[in-house]
Amino acid sequence: MSQWTPEYNELYTLKVDMKSEIPSDAPKTQESLKGILLHPEPIGAAKSFPAGVEMINSKVGNEFSHLCDDSQKQEKDMNGNQQEQEKSLVVRKKRKSQQAGPSYVQNCVKENQGILGLRQHLGTPSDEDNDSSFSDCLSSPSSSLHFGDSDTVTSDEDKEVSVRHSQTILNAKSRSHSARSHKWPRTETESVSGLLMKRPCLHGSSLRRLPCRKRFVKNNSSQRTQKQKERILMQRKKREVLARRKYALLPSSSSSSENDLSSESSSSSSTEGEEDLFVSASENHQNNPAVPSGSIDEDVVVIEASSTPQVTANEEINVTSTDSEVEIVTVGESYRSRSTLGHSRSHWSQGSSSHASRPQEPRNRSRISTVIQPLRQNAAEVVDLTVDEDEPTVVPTTSARMESQATSASINNSNPSTSEQASDTASAVTGSQPSTVSETSATLTSNSTTGTSIGDDSRRTTSSAVMETGPPAMPRLPSCCPQHSPCGGSSQNHHALGHPHTSCFQQHGHHFQHHHHHHHTPHPAVPVSPSFSDPACPVERPPQVQAPCGANSSSGTSYHEQQALPVDLSNNGIRSHGSGSFHGASAFDPCCPVSSSRAAIFGHQAAAAAPSQPLSSIDGYGSSMVAQPQPQPPPQPSLSSCRHYMPPTYASLTRPLHHQASACPHSHGNPPPQTQPPPQVDYVIPHPVHAFHSQISSHATSHPVAPPPPTHLASTAAPIPQHLPPTHQPISHHIPATAPPAQRLHPHEVMQRMEVRRRRMMQHPTRAHERPPPHPHRMHPNYGHGHHIHVPQTMSSHPRQAPERSAWELGIEAGVTAATYTPGALHPHLAHYHAPPRLHHLQLGALPLMVPDMAGYPHIRYISSGLDGTSFRGPFRGNFEELIHLEERLGNVNRGASQGTIERCTYPHKYKKRKLHCKQDGEEGTEEDTEEKCTICLSILEEGEDVRRLPCMHLFHQVCVDQWLITNKKCPICRVDIEAQLPSES
């Protein structure tokens, strides 16, 4: 710790620099932090801290020992490396606004026992938010990290960590990311806990690490004692209970709810052991190696999908807790993109409580559970985010907060005072820049105003850092957080991946920061090409992609306005690799104008493994986000694991809010070929939806923003590995492959368009050549399936020309089907054909013959499935043409008798009038008594006409009955099979 003392001073100086940028709130916290920084005693005392704190220290040290070049840090932390990593707790102060946590920290600092105080807070499980905050910070990696990050309060931990990381880290990082030194260059040498705590900050190039964050990293080599562990678990459980009670959080995310873990905190925390990897461009390399998943705090569940360095692949747990009670806990791998970095990601979403018990899981398995609780900032419908294990899906409630976070993330340091936002933003910027941006924009706009300019440069720095930041914990995304948070934390991880998207990030972050409204052009600069040596993600990540991101961010802007929508961001969470893609997510964030960050976050392919399939469907959730389809990484094949295509999942914001985490499975179903959506920079379209985003069940997604490569197809919900999780595929057929208008279309409109398309296709009857003169209504691909069935008509004894097909006939065909099978039995679309009304056209004479017979064929119910392979998608088909064709096709299905069979089984002859037996005696019988009618054409049989008597002895005109029998070999009257009667007929 003594080593850190100089660092502390240095950090303090940084802090001071930042301080001017920090809002009045932050200064207080900073003051206390300064106290800590100035007085290393707490750090020195840290060793006297409870074992838990020590554990954090050692753990952090261990974790980052690999990562950090800082030999000092390594020396300190190396001893307890793994254990410490596992146990290291970072105490992050919650924003003052959020909880007493930060103030606690301040008090502790004042007491010069800040660390101890924090430790104590952590140690003593308390239901109080303050206590829980601290305990969360300590016990819950996500808490502790994120709190520090999100807290406007200066993060002592940050300072400490940076100090620990030593000037070397400062030098190494050169803090270039943000002109501000206030972002402690977080070397990986920084104690692991420090990194974890600050992970977002770190890779955020410390940018995000605003002094705002109060984070105490206890670098003691002692492991956390059993008691402490129990306490942590207890605290988590309490928090979880409170969260559930309060916010009805998902079990997995409940732990963060009470804690109000900032998404950053969560996210950092989540990777606490594994990596507080704040991958800065500079620090990236350091962080990458470190962060063994094993080093994760017990409480932290690290999911390590990839063997690649755990670049700050924090799973983003965004627990956003605004001053109000809203907390969004988004636990998602912030895009497995991080995982591409190989950083393990803990899914905090599992709830702090679960973290402790949870073993590191493969990142793939990381689940993102985001619960959006009443978001204080946005209308914030509270959205439940269900997290797919594979797919982080967040149901973001729209929340300015998210934006603010994003802004904060970008601003990060820029507005310390909006520490919550700044930290959120930082986290967002780094991690879920796009998404956070969105949220931030709203909150930040006010808060981050000060930070805006700061945010800008910080963002800019962030942009480079952002990439690294990729993993930054998701900023607290109260509203949009699910999307952002997952995105932000991890998504930006793709930045960490060295994704060029950083610029996107930054753009999102800082622009949003300024105001979610601005469209941010990508800051191509900041390619920060994979500054971190992401083994999995070759540096090749092309920064160029960023531009598209930029564009997206623009669109994100658009979206943020919609951000009120409580969109599920579930798909967003999609860990699309193509983080870049969804940087644009700002558009993406339905909730957050700048949801793109959210998208980006997710996009960052939580699934490193399926890098190529960022699951662009990231849920396409924020259409905007989707807006930037950029499959940026495509150029970087090696990125494949890293591939951050965030295929912008444009699920339009219109996407049903109900759409849950993976809820929007079908919405992603569309695997638009969109192999690589053009980097549509600017999807201002509030809800551009990738075709594949059709995922929006509403089909609003009809706008397929340049879909990311199909691989991304993103089954946002589906495991990234699968490009198109089956869940999403369902919709795919509904959504036109072509990108429809960016604007949201009403589902019916979408269907209508599809219908038009379909009709065009159908205009080429497959068997038209086999048919009688084409009937306008018969121009259906299936038309040829059945020989033209002429419904018996009394008007003519000749086969009716197709054009003659009368309404009543149509009515019979359609009506019979409708009448026989209730709408439920019919294909959903058939119900749209209001066949029953047509029944009035039916003539009673025909009805008994036609309806019963046709009704008897179950095939009717399958007709709609489209034997030709096309299903009836159009909601309405004039004239029931579909039904008609189906009915005709039915004829083949029914296997009407062949002409040979008809001749063999029936008795054709010339009709001779004969008197009824009862009338034979008296000629007085009227002529009518002797008349017989063909029940098919309803014409009276004339002497000498060719008639055919069926085995059942019913008599019909040959022409009439032959037509019937070709379609159906049963008697039109009694429905007795002509062949079945053959033996008895003799």
From Swiss-Prot:
Q: Where does Zn(2+) bind?
A: 934, 937, 957, 960
**Glycyl lysine isopeptide (Lys-Gly) (interchain with G-Cter in SUMO2) crosslink residues:** 19, 28, 34, 47, 59, 73, 87, 96, 110, 173, 198, 218, 915, 919
Instruction: Cite the SUPFAM superfamilies for this sequence.
Output: RING/U-box (SSF57850)
Enumerate composition-biased segments (Basic and acidic residues).
Answer: 66-89
Outline the segment boundaries, as ranges, of region: Interaction with AXIN1.
241-404
One Gene Ontology term from the biological process aspect of the record: DNA repair
Q: Where is the composition biased (Basic residues)?
A: 174-184, 508-522
- What Gene Ontology cellular-component terms does the record carry? cytoplasm; PML body
Which reaction does this chain catalyze?
S-ubiquitinyl-[E2 ubiquitin-conjugating enzyme]-L-cysteine + [acceptor protein]-L-lysine = [E2 ubiquitin-conjugating enzyme]-L-cysteine + N(6)-ubiquitinyl-[acceptor protein]-L-lysine
Return the motif ranges for SUMO interaction motif 3 (SIM): 382-386
Q: Pathway membership of this protein?
A: Protein modification; protein ubiquitination
The ranges of region (Ubiquitin binding) come to 907-909, 949-953
Subunit structure, briefly? Monomer. Interacts with SMAD6, SMAD7, AXIN1, AXIN2 and SKIL isoform SNON. Interacts with (phosphorylated) SMAD2 and SMAD3. Part of a complex containing RNF111, AXIN1 and SMAD7. Interacts (via SIM domains) with SUMO1 and SUMO2.
Protein name, per record:
E3 ubiquitin-protein ligase Arkadia
Q: Which gene encodes it?
A: RNF111
